[in-house]
């Protein structure tokens, strides 16, 4: 029962869309209504408001970190086990992708996934973030960096911690993140994906 309750709480935390919340508080249009329609930091940046984009990025990462950290810190006293913690990690990510507060129209999950990985294991999170930075620096594609980082994350976890129940959760998160980037993948293959710093290609 503890596993299910903590997972439900994590899903509700994940369902808070900081792109929507920050935009509303700062008088910006709903992120679903412009650009890619994706409620994430990259789309919020298209308004030209860098502060709003940064706050969105921090908020989305923080909720992923917070849900897992709280469960790991306080959950065992209430009967939460390793399977439950893996459920929490997956649930907060699903909350971001399919938020109950926003008609299940969520973001792609890059920042939230980063927060989750940092909470699971700081070295794992930093290693995955380093992978993103390296790919982004050399190739200048944010989406490609996210895809490569998502592919490597489960392998990093196995190398550091072996195969466990959390491996399965990280693998599912990676698959879902890649699936959320299917339009970006098509644009990359067609040479139409915008590079970091470029204006959005039509």
Curated annotation (Swiss-Prot):
Gene Ontology annotations for the cellular component aspect, listed alphabetically: plasma membrane
GO molecular function, one term: acyl-phosphate glycerol-3-phosphate acyltransferase activity
Catalytic activity: an acyl phosphate + sn-glycerol 3-phosphate = a 1-acyl-sn-glycero-3-phosphate + phosphate
Top-level division of the source organism's lineage: Bacteria
Transmembrane segments: 2-22, 80-100, 119-139, 158-178
Pfam families recorded: G3P_acyltransf
Pathway per the UniProt entry: Lipid metabolism; phospholipid metabolism
GO-annotated biological processes: phospholipid biosynthetic process
Enzyme Commission no: 2.3.1.275
InterPro entries: G3P_acylTferase_PlsY
Annotated compartments: Cell inner membrane
Topology relative to the membrane: Multi-pass membrane protein
Keywords: Cell inner membrane, Cell membrane, Lipid biosynthesis, Lipid metabolism, Membrane, Phospholipid biosynthesis, Phospholipid metabolism, Transferase, Transmembrane, Transmembrane helix
Broadest EC class assigned to this enzyme: transferase
Self-association and partners: Probably interacts with PlsX.
Role: Catalyzes the transfer of an acyl group from acyl-phosphate (acyl-PO(4)) to glycerol-3-phosphate (G3P) to form lysophosphatidic acid (LPA). This enzyme utilizes acyl-phosphate as fatty acyl donor, but not acyl-CoA or acyl-ACP.
Database matches in HAMAP family: PlsY
Family per record: Belongs to the PlsY family.
Protein name: Glycerol-3-phosphate acyltransferase
Gene name as annotated: plsY
């Amino acid at each position: 029962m503890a596993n299910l309750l903590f997972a439900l709480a994590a899903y509700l935390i994940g369902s808070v869309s900081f792109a929507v919340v920050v935009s509303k508080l700062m008088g910006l249009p709903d992120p679903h209504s412009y650009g890619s329609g994706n409620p994430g930091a990259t789309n919020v940046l298209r308004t030209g408001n860098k502060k709003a984009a940064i706050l969105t990025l921090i908020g989305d990462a923080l909720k992923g970190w917070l849900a897992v950290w709280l469960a790991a810190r306080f959950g065992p006293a209430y009967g939460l086990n390793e399977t439950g913690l893996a459920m929490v990690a997956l649930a907060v990510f699903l909350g971001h992708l399919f938020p109950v507060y926003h008609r299940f129209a969520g973001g792609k999950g890059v920042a939230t996934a980063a927060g989750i990985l940092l909470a699971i294991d700081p070295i794992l999170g930093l290693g995955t973030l380093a992978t993103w930075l390296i790919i982004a620096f050399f190739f200048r594609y944010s989406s490609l960096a996210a895809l490569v980082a998502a592919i490597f994350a489960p392998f990093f976890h196995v190398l550091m911690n072996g195969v466990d129940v959390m491996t399965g959760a990280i693998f599912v998160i990676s698959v879902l993140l890649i699936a959320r980037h299917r339009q970006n993948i098509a644009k990359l293959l067609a040479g139409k994906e915008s590079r970091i710093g470029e204006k959005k290609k039509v």
